[in-house]
């Protein structure tokens, strides 16, 4: 019963569209502001210095490529699996730094106004995203094809979800910015 519900075209379309929007909205600012993203990568201190710049150059293109792969029905299951793997890697990178006590750094997920400090909550978020992506990779080959109504509802719901997440992230960033400026004033 639950598997049939999860394999509903409107559900798979929603998850697919959400991952497309998430990956594209994460990749584009990294491409536009490469030096800033390079600084974020270096700040994680998980790789040798000489590898940080190539990684910072390749990662946004990988995110964008996976987003494009999710658009195409023939490559969507593979792209969903790759998205899940990427979320696991991001979660591990965040978890390592949280365990080190390095929570004051930006996760690099999005850009400036949406800076998010590292936390176990972000690790959990990435675990949930990985689970959704791996589930999508598993369900897409057996899910019925989406019709126009499924596509419209799935993409609209994904777009609204992204807007809500962006809004919450912006408000959180404004709150933490206000708190840090109050602390610096004494």
Curated annotation (Swiss-Prot):
InterPro entries: Methylamine_util_MauE. Its main location: membrane. GO terms for cellular component: plasma membrane. GO terms for biological process: methylamine metabolic process. Pathway: One-carbon metabolism; methylamine degradation. The chain crosses the membrane at residues 2-22, 54-74, 76-96, 129-149, 151-171. The keyword Thylakoid does not apply. The keyword Membrane applies. Keywords: Cell membrane, Membrane, Transmembrane, Transmembrane helix. It is a multi-pass membrane protein. It comes from the Bacteria. It is found in: Cell membrane. May be specifically involved in the processing, transport, and/or maturation of the MADH beta-subunit. This is Methylamine utilization protein MauE. It comes from Methylorubrum extorquens (strain ATCC 14718 / DSM 1338 / JCM 2805 / NCIMB 9133 / AM1).
């Amino acid at each position: 019963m639950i598997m049939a519900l999860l394999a509903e075209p409107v559900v798979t379309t929603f998850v697919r569209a959400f991952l497309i929007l998430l990956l594209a909205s994460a990749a584009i600012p990294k491409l536009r502001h490469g030096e800033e993203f390079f600084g974020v990568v270096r700040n994680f201190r998980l790789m040798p210095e000489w590898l940080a710049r190539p990684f910072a150059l390749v990662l946004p293109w990988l995110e964008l490529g996976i987003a494009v792969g999710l658009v195409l029905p023939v490559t969507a299951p593979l792209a969903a699996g790759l998205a899940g793997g990427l979320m696991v890697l991001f979660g591990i990178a965040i978890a390592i730094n949280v365990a080190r006590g390095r929570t004051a750094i930006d996760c690099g997920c999005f850009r400036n106004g949406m800076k998010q400090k590292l936390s176990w909550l972000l690790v959990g978020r990435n675990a949930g995203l990985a689970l959704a992506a791996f589930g999508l990779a598993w369900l897409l080959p057996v899910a019925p094809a989406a019709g126009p109504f499924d596509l419209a509802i799935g993409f609209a719901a994904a777009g609204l979800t992204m807007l809500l997440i962006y809004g919450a992230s912006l408000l959180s960033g404004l709150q933490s910015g206000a708190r840090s400026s109050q602390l610096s004033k004494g």
